[in-house]
UniProtKB/Swiss-Prot annotation:
Pathway: Glycolipid biosynthesis; 4-amino-4-deoxy-alpha-L-arabinose undecaprenyl phosphate biosynthesis; 4-amino-4-deoxy-alpha-L-arabinose undecaprenyl phosphate from UDP-4-deoxy-4-formamido-beta-L-arabinose and undecaprenyl phosphate: step 1/2; Bacterial outer membrane biogenesis; lipopolysaccharide biosynthesis
Function: Catalyzes the transfer of 4-deoxy-4-formamido-L-arabinose from UDP to undecaprenyl phosphate. The modified arabinose is attached to lipid A and is required for resistance to polymyxin and cationic antimicrobial peptides.
PANTHER family (alphabetical): UNDECAPRENYL-PHOSPHATE 4-DEOXY-4-FORMAMIDO-L-ARABINOSE TRANSFERASE, UNDECAPRENYL-PHOSPHATE 4-DEOXY-4-FORMAMIDO-L-ARABINOSE TRANSFERASE-RELATED
Listed name of the protein: Undecaprenyl-phosphate 4-deoxy-4-formamido-L-arabinose transferase
Annotated catalysed reactions: UDP-4-deoxy-4-formamido-beta-L-arabinose + di-trans,octa-cis-undecaprenyl phosphate = 4-deoxy-4-formamido-alpha-L-arabinopyranosyl di-trans,octa-cis-undecaprenyl phosphate + UDP
Gene3D superfamilies: Spore Coat Polysaccharide Biosynthesis Protein SpsA, Chain A (3.90.550.10)
Subcellular location: Cell membrane
Family: Belongs to the glycosyltransferase 2 family.
GO BP annotations, alphabetical order: 4-amino-4-deoxy-alpha-L-arabinopyranosyl undecaprenyl phosphate biosynthetic process; lipid A biosynthetic process; lipopolysaccharide biosynthetic process; response to antibiotic
Length: 323
């Protein structure tokens, strides 16, 4: 049984003024009942609502457990999480969303499993309360990951996850934009478990998840998997990914564009193999170039994936212009 000295909670925030006060209240209340030191690191990812003001006020309170990190602009959830990882000091780190769909009251459940010796504690949402678009897109991504990397987990998209410090330190060594943290973490350890957690309908604000973010997520997922597969000389697996994506893109392209063109159905169908071939060629060239750039340039120069405006910690505000 492991005993952790300190817990770090990482919460990325973007325009969550409606849920932020309730989020902080419930998270602090949950953590204060634990027999462990803790910090709650909330990263504002360039919000343009009142989230910044709320965070500043909460972090500047006497004996506040809130560490507020303010990024210079909206870099995306991944970069915000990486900023939180870098400035965390706990030997156990838990990530969670700010929308309260996964309740903070589930945190002790993750700690209990981490104490059993698991390096990574994933979660899957029971009776998921999202709309059909999020459910289908999440299911699609989970299927792609399971087929390609062979790690059978039910829900790679749930943000409520726990990592021990060794895993966090290894993740920070990558320092790239196009990595998918759950996949990377799972490749760094075989000592992994996935547990069920509660999931509620979104009560505050609206979801930031849309088609554009789904495409970006698939892009990051694609390059993250491919980078690891190329290092392991598994080119066939990459080819399978390309075929899968090509077929998927062809179907989408067919429904969006071809159905609007007045052509015989036979000629419309003929376009599909052409699209697949072109997509495969282009994707293969792009991925090889991308990975070569990563290998020869990113390793030589650690490019920043985010810039911090300021940090408020221990009731003290500090301006900061670096990562």
């Amino acid at each position: 049984m492991l005993n952790f000295k300190k817990l770090s909670i990482i919460i990325p925030v973007y325009n969550e003024q409606d849920s932020l006060i309730e989020l902080i209240k419930r998270t602090v209340n949950t953590c204060s009942k634990l027999k462990i030191k803790y910090e709650i690191i909330i990263i504002d990812d360039g919000s343009n609502d009142k989230s910044i003001n709320i965070l500043e006020k909460e972090a500047l309170k006497q004996n506040s457990k809130i560490v507020a990190i303010f990024l210079k602009k909206n870099y995306g959830q991944h970069s915000a999480i990486m900023a939180g990882f870098k400035h965390s000091s706990g030997d156990l780190v838990i990530t969670m969303d700010a929308d309260l769909q996964n309740p903070p009251e589930e945190i002790p459940k993750l700690i209990l499993n981490a104490e059993k010796g698991y390096d990574v504690i994933g979660t899957f949402r029971q009776n998921r309360k999202d709309n059909w678009f999020r459910k289908i897109s999440s299911r699609l991504i989970n299927i792609i990951i399971q087929i390609v990397i062979g790690k059978s987990m039910k829900d790679y998209g749930c943000m409520l996850r726990a990592y021990n410090r060794n895993i966090i330190n290894s993740i920070l060594e990558y320092n790239k934009k196009n990595i998918f943290i759950p996949i990377l973490a799972n490749t760094l350890s075989k000592n992994i478990i996935e547990i069920p957690v509660l999931h509620y309908e979104r009560e505050f604000g609206c979801s930031k998840y849309n088609l554009i973010k789904l495409i970006k997520l698939i892009y990051d997922l694609f390059f993250c998997i491919s980078f690891n597969l190329i290092k392991k000389n598994k080119m066939f697996n990459i080819f399978i990914i390309l075929i899968f994506l090509a077929v998927l893109m062809s179907i989408v392209f067919f429904f969006i564009f071809f159905l609007k063109i007045k052509l015989n159905i036979f000629y419309k169908i003929l376009f599909i193999p052409i699209i697949i071939t072109l997509f495969l060629i282009k994707s293969f060239i792009i991925i090889i170039l991308k990975i070569l750039i990563d290998i020869f340039f990113v390793k030589a120069k650690k490019n920043s994936i985010y810039y911090i405006n300021k940090i408020i910690k221990n009731n003290f505000s500090k301006k900061k212009d670096v990562t």
